[in-house]
Design a protein with these regions (language model features):
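N-terminal catalytic or cofactor-binding beta/alpha core of small enzyme domains
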Residues: 2-252
């Protein structure tokens, strides 16, 4: 289950890994029945990048299947509660739910936010305590244009530049993908900063670099919109390049 063997190669001289975990915080745009009335007439908002990360769940599943890794995927719309924000963050709730009574917002946190976060935090804590080093890949996607401005990248890796393990792993994965697809526009810490509030940022506070490497993988949604061969090819290349970065052989 996500356990790799020590091996020679560039990737493992940069980062040794033991346990791979795949998560997806914005995998769907589902609305629980109890809150359906709040979202009446908001289909366009739910379908937009504000409602979910299109393609992130599909990519997350393919990565988890390829490595036999534990997966923690959420399909409730982020407009109900954003699983990639900390409690108290101003964007934890959207304009749809922010004005709800405190008790109802707490109910949302208890039923939809905490189960996802606690499952991930618990799994990583158990393996860290047992001496494993966890590689956590959070699958995300971003809209091709934001406020009318095109985003000039295809794939990006978000990480904390103060953590050597994350720097090395993101670079190894990026270089492995670049070798397979030099035509792709690849960047690091774009279109967001890896140190910003989020699940990986929370986990970094609890685990040292030697025990935890947290990477948010961001893919441009224009591939998802194309569907077909371009999207399938990108997913396959991301899995293959991740395998190389991890230093894992295909016959393990």
């Amino acid at each position: 289950m996500g356990v790799g063997r020590a091996a020679t190669g560039v990737a493992l001289t940069l980062v040794r890994w033991n346990f791979l975990v795949i998560t997806c915080e914005h995998g769907g745009r589902e609305v629980p029945q109890a809150y359906a009335a709040l979202f009446s007439g908001r289909d366009a908002l739910l379908d937009s990048h504000r409602g979910w990360d299109a393609g992130a769940l599909e990519l997350g599943r393919q990565m988890a299947d390829a490595f036999g890794s534990p997966r923690h995927f959420a399909t409730t719309t982020r407009l109900l509660v954003d699983l990639n924000r900390s409690i108290g963050h101003r964007q934890l709730f959207s304009e749809v739910t922010r004005a709800l009574p405190r008790a109802r917002r707490q109910d949302i946190v208890d039923h939809y936010y905490r189960p996802h976060r606690q499952a991930i935090e618990g799994e990583i804590a158990r393996h860290s305590a047992a001496g494993w080093r966890v590689i956590h890949v959070a699958s995300h996607s971003f809209t091709p244009k934001f406020d009318g401005v095109p985003r000039q990248t295809d794939v990006a890796w978000l990480y904390d530049p103060r953590r050597p393990g994350e720097v090395a792993f993101a670079r190894a994965w990026m270089l492995a993908l670049e070798q397979r697809a030099p035509e792709l526009r690849l960047r690091r810490n774009y279109p967001y900063q890896g140190r910003s509030d989020g699940l990986t940022a929370t986990l970094r506070k609890r685990h040292p670099d030697a025990a935890y490497v947290g990477i948010e993988l961001e893919v441009n949604q224009h591939f998802v919109e194309q569907r077909g061969a371009p999207w399938r090819r990108l997913r396959t290349m991301l899995v293959d390049s991740l395998r190389k970065a991890l230093g894992e052989t295909t016959d393990r």
